[in-house]
From Swiss-Prot:
Record bears the keyword Transmembrane helix: yes
Protein's name in the database: Protein ssh4
Compartment annotation: Vacuole membrane; Endosome membrane
Family: Belongs to the SSH4 family.
SMART domains: SPRY
Cystine pairs: none
Glycosylation site positions: N435, N506
Region ranges (Disordered): 375-414, 426-537
Organism of provenance: Botryotinia fuckeliana (strain B05.10) (Noble rot fungus)
Transmembrane parts of this sequence: 74-94
Biological processes annotated in GO: protein transport
InterPro entries registered for this protein in UniProt: B30.2/SPRY (IPR001870), B30.2/SPRY_sf (IPR043136), ConA-like_dom_sf (IPR013320), SPRY_dom (IPR003877), SPRY_Ssh4-like (IPR035780), Ubq-SigPath_Reg (IPR050618)
Cytoplasmic side, ranges: 1-73
GO cellular-component term (any): endosome membrane
Lineage: Eukaryota, Fungi, Dikarya, Ascomycota, Pezizomycotina
């Protein structure tokens, strides 16, 4: 029994150790303590689970910490970049404020362009300083130009292209543009529309038409043909009305590139350096972009920087001025440009040729006025010009007008004389016959023989239709313009025999002998009558 109880205790202890389940069987205190110690110690499975849980939690903590560090790095980088940009912009604004708003100036347009400050105080200060340095003549000219601009503001006159000017551009092309010199100043001379010659005083000239605004870019060039060293040339654009006794670029609204290398934009006092100086032989180009109102210049085919912006509402005219003797030739597009881009893209003011047809050739076509003015048949009875219908041609080439219906002087082909012809004005209406009764001329006018004037007793010979042309002649060809519409078939004449030829020869000799005898008898009869007349007297 004790052995059985002892075995049960061992099995219960083993079961409790393996399954960690408390037993209800009473055991001894030592066994209970041993069991308690065993239960308190973790098993290998529990150790593995605890290790896995610990590693997972540590990985989660590390991943979370790495994500937080990445986000923090990105945020710090963005904040540093924006902070640097804001700092640079702030520094730039400070420099800009102290540089461009000094002396009470107010900037109304872009940076770094002269003449764009509309501050009255600053302009008055510059004007006072400039007037002190001017001599009497320069001061007078400046005050005169100032008064002109005040009384004639820019664009105060209608300068838009009218319908008639538009039609002229369509007909003439680029030849519609030409420079108009001021006749009152008479200091420049324009030849062949675009060749300008200046003399000894200051003046400028503008074109008759403004620069169009339909295309993307318009461009024109000026070549310096003759320029002394002390002559100042100013090339650019200006609005109308403009004081023509001043150079372009000196007053509103005008932009110019001077021969000293400076640019003038509404600046009568001074201008900054813009580009290299140009001398005799150089080619200066002016470009205009209507959509943005941008003006740029070129020198010998090389583009320079833009000068002005925002000139979109004004009508700009090409302008050339000088203060001394020089010669400038302007190319609006009638020939090739030196600036390659403008030459390829056709930046001229208009096409080279318009739709206007050339004048008709003068000749015998459709009764040319130059040829018909000296002929007697050129005017009808009422004094109006009537073209000769015999000179007309049609596209068919075979149509021919009939003979003229109005009567004219009738001459025989054999009556040739160098004497002066006597002209009798015709009072017949067109369509009447040429042999109608005509009152005899009075006033002692005598008719001379051999002049082709016939009386009623001897009417002119009847006109017959011309013989048909031979098959091989130009009139006989069906493709020729001289081919008559009515053609008759002709048969070749028969070839006479030898007997017929001898008989015809004998008949001609006998006819000649009879006519000679008649002539001798008539001469003898006239001689007898002449001898008898003196005896009767």
């Amino acid at each position: 029994m004790e052995d059985f109880l002892r075995g049960m205790q061992q099995s219960t202890l083993t079961t409790s150790v393996l399954f960690a389940t408390p037993t209800s069987i009473p055991i001894i205190a030592a066994a209970q303590e041993a069991l308690r110690d065993t239960l308190q110690q973790p098993t290998s499975l529990q150790r593995a689970a605890a290790a896995v849980a610990t590693s997972t939690s540590s990985d989660n903590v590390q991943l979370k910490s790495s994500n937080d560090s990445t986000i923090n790095g990105v945020v710090i980088g963005l904040l540093s970049s924006f902070g640097s940009a804001i700092l640079i912009a702030f520094i730039f604004l400070i420099v800009y404020f102290f540089k461009y708003t000094s002396s009470g100036r107010i900037l109304l347009d872009r940076i770094g362009r002269p003449g764009e400050y509309d501050d009255e105080q600053a302009f008055a200060k510059e004007e006072a300083e400039a007037l002190e340095e001017m001599d009497d003549l320069q001061r007078t000219e400046y005050l005169r130009a100032k008064a002109f601009v005040q009384s004639n503001p820019p664009d105060s006159l209608p300068t838009d292209i009218s319908l008639s000017q538009y039609l002229a551009i369509q007909e003439k092309g680029v030849s519609a543009w030409e420079f108009e010199p001021e006749l009152e100043i008479a200091n420049c001379f324009v030849e062949a529309r675009t060749e300008i010659e200046f003399f000894d005083s200051e003046c400028c000239t503008l074109t008759n038409l403004p620069v169009p605004k339909q295309n993307e870019v318009y461009y024109w060039e000026s070549k310096i043909y003759d320029k002394p060293e002390n002559t100042l040339i100013s090339i650019g654009v200006a609005t109308k009305p403009y004081p023509l006794f001043r150079l372009p670029g000196w007053h509103k609204y005008s932009v110019a590139y001077t021969s000293t290398g400076h640019r003038r934009y509404n600046q009568p006092f001074s201008g900054p350096v813009y580009g290299p100086q140009y001398v005799q032989g150089d080619v200066i180009g002016v470009g205009y972009r209507p959509r943005t109102g941008t003006i740029f210049f070129t020198r010998n085919g090389k583009k320079l920087e833009d000068v002005a912006h925002g000139l979109k509402s004004q009508n700009l005219f090409p302008a050339v001025g000088a203060n001394g003797p020089c010669t400038v030739h302007v190319n609006f597009g009638q020939s090739g440009f030196v600036f390659i881009e403008a030459n390829v893209k056709k930046w001229g003011l208009a096409p080279m040729t318009g739709s206007l047809a050339p004048p008709p050739p003068y000749g015998s076509e459709q009764g040319s006025i130059l040829l018909e003015a000296g002929r007697e048949g050129a005017q009808s009875s009422n004094g109006h010009y009537q073209p000769d219908p015999r000179h007309g041609r049609t596209r068919s080439g075979n149509f021919r007008h009939g003979p003229p219906t109005s009567p004219g002087p009738i001459r025989s082909p054999t009556d040739i004389s160098l004497a002066q012809l006597t002209h009798f004005p015709s009072h017949e209406e067109p369509g009447e016959a040429s042999n109608s009764s005509t009152p005899a001329p009075t006033g002692g006018v005598t008719q001379q023989s051999g002049l082709g004037v016939h009386d009623n007793a001897q009417p002119p010979p009847e006109y017959t239709s011309p013989l048909p042309s031979a098959a091989g002649s130009p009139r006989g060809s069906t493709d020729s313009e001289r081919t008559p519409m009515l053609r008759r078939k002709t048969t070749p004449p028969p070839i006479p025999s030898y007997n017929d030829a001898v008989a015809q020869r004998n008949r001609s000799h006998s006819h000649r002998d009879r006519s000679g005898g008649r002539r001798e008898r008539s001469d003898s009869h006239r001689a007898r009558q002449g001898d008898g007349n003196p005896s009767q007297s």
